Amino acid sequence: HRDLHSFPTRRSSDLAGSAIAMQIIRVQNRSVGLPAIQEPEYRSITVEAGMSARQVSQLLEQARLIDDARAFERFLEVSGDARRLQQGTYLFKRGMSYASIAEEMVNIPQAVSKRSLVVYAGYTLRDIDSLLGNSGLAGDGEFLQAVQTVAFERGLPFTEGWFLSGTYEISQQKHVALSLAIAMQDALNEAVRPYLAELERLDITLAQAIIIASMIQRETNEVSQMPIISGVIHNRIKADMPLGIDATLRYGLGVWDRPLTETELQSDHPFNTRRTQGLPPSGIGAASMAALDAALMPQDHQWYYYIHDKQGNLHPAKTYGEHKENIARYL
C-alpha cells in the first residue's frame, strides 16, 4: 500500500549527566548484547571553577590524554599557565602536545555569545551534524565525533537515540558540538530518571526503551497516537512477532526519499524489522519527551497492527484480517 515514511511527515507502519544517571545507564545496558563503543580518538574533560593545576593534570591522565600527571603539572608551573587555566569543557585529541593542551585551556574568548538551537524530534545524528555545519557552529563531522566521545565515556552501548531532541542554548565558542552532545545526553538522563520503575514493570532495559521511543517518533508526530503505537510495539515483542516498522530499514539504508524496493524489503539487513526478530541494533533518531514517555508508558490494549490513512489518522487492528480490511478501507 501507499508509502508514507518520508521524514518529517507522518508515517504508516506495514505491521506495526550525573554519576547516578551514568550508573543507572550502565546497569540497564548490561543485557543489550551489543558490541561496546570503540575508544574514540578524542576525549573530553570538564574543568570546574577553582580546580588546581594538579587536579586538571589528574583529569587529563584519567582520560588517557597524557601519560604522566606530575610531568604535565610541572610543565604548567614552568610555562606560567598553572594559575591561568579556565573552567569549561574541552575536547582533546589523544597524542596532543603539552603545549597544545595548555593553550586550549588558557586562550579562550572571555565574551561568548549564546544562541538557541532547535534539534527537531526524529533528527538522526547525521542530521544534527549537518544542522551545526549549516549554522556555522561546527565543522563537518564534529558532532558525530563528539557523540562517539560521549558514548564511550558514559558507557553507552550505541549512539543513535541517546540524545534527546529539544531546544538548547549554545555558547558560540570552541567545542560547540561537544557541548551540545553533552547537553542532549544529560537531558535524556534527567528525562528517564522518573521512569526507572516502569523499566522493571515492562521487563526491558533502558537501551531497549530508547530504541522503542525512536521508532515511535519516526512513526508519528501526533502525541495522542504515541501510546497506542507503543502498545502495538510492546504487544508484538511479547508475542515474538516481527515489528515490521519500515522506518528502521530506511534508517539502516539511509533511504528516506523514495519507496523501498521489494528486494530491500526482503533483505536480511539487521535494521529490517520485517525479517529480523526483535528490536533493531540501535535507535533510529532523536526522540521527543512525548515519545520517550509513550515508550515507557504504553497503552494497554489488544492491537497488533496499525496503519495511517492519507490524512494521518491512526487505524489499529487486533488481527491481520482486520488490518487488511483497514488497508482496503482507508488507503
Regions found by a protein language model. Give the residues of each.
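Short alpha-helical segment immediately N-terminal to, or the first helix within
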Residues: 1, 45-46, 218-219
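Short, small-residue-biased leader/transition segments that mark boundaries at the very start
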Residues: 1-12
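Single-pass alpha-helical transmembrane signal-anchor segments
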Residues: 10-23
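Signal peptide-directed extracytoplasmic domains
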Residues: 20-194
